[in-house]
């Protein structure tokens, strides 16, 4: 079992397969930042599988594949297939912007992917294009339909709520999810890659987001508790699940159960800190053993920070 010094059990590994993305969302890549880790520095698929297997042997049971945009990763379906076969891994999910989903949905299903999260901040074509730096909403909608067709369910839509930008689309997004029978997760805008003034101006606390929802839809608490940080409520009468993620206004650090493996092979212990441990350097060292890798991971997790620093941004 993998524990840190605050007695939190780590069960969830998030793997960033690539830094590359086919969108340019202004809050994710500010100032048109297109600087990526060189391809030569990426973990190979075999290295990713090795590290993931060791995490599974240490007690991790949930793996989420993300990016950048993970569907840009060569052999993505093979990776899904191999990870889903690992002993101890009972949940393999993927977070995508949906642009390529129409193409990949059947292959992902056949590879053993359990479920999908799709990032979607607007269902208005012009606003979607503005937020994403030129993205085509139609492709995402086609990807959602293809995923439903091939049974990649449940599908969760992740909407980052930004005051003055897309907070007027919360209710239309709920209606869209009701129609498609999707789970909606409403996320607070987080200070990642943004100046503090941007965050202060755009941030809408989850409490305020919930109040806006409750003005239009009656809500009741759900007992659902997934591996992630969302607190869920039902829309009464319709059964739609809405998750509220309050990463800034009411952090969930005491129950944090995850770490992130970057495409470079560095283990990132907390999004709100810069601390990293280079696992690629470990596994590429001649003569290193699996036990050496396990000990490195255990020592890294033990040093995981108690809380993030978002509120100081």
Name every feature range the model reports, one short phrase each:
Residues 9, 14, 27, 51, ...:
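Residue-level recognition of specific faces of alpha-helices
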Residues 18-20, 111, 236, 262:
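A short, compositionally biased micro-patch
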Residues 42-65, 72-187:
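Radical SAM/AdoMet-radical enzyme domain recognition
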Residues 23, 125-126, 251, 277:
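Glycine-centered loop/turn positions within well-structured domains
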Residues 24, 28, 73, 126, ...:
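Residues that scaffold the ATP/ADP-binding catalytic core of kinase and kinase-like folds
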Residues 33-38, 124-131, 193-197, 278-280:
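A short acidic, helix-capping loop that chelates divalent metal ions and anchors anionic groups
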Residues 6-44, 271:
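Canonical Radical SAM [4Fe-4S] cluster-binding loop centered on the CxxxCxxC motif
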Residues 1-12, 175, 179, 189-313:
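Auxiliary Fe-S-binding modules of radical SAM enzymes
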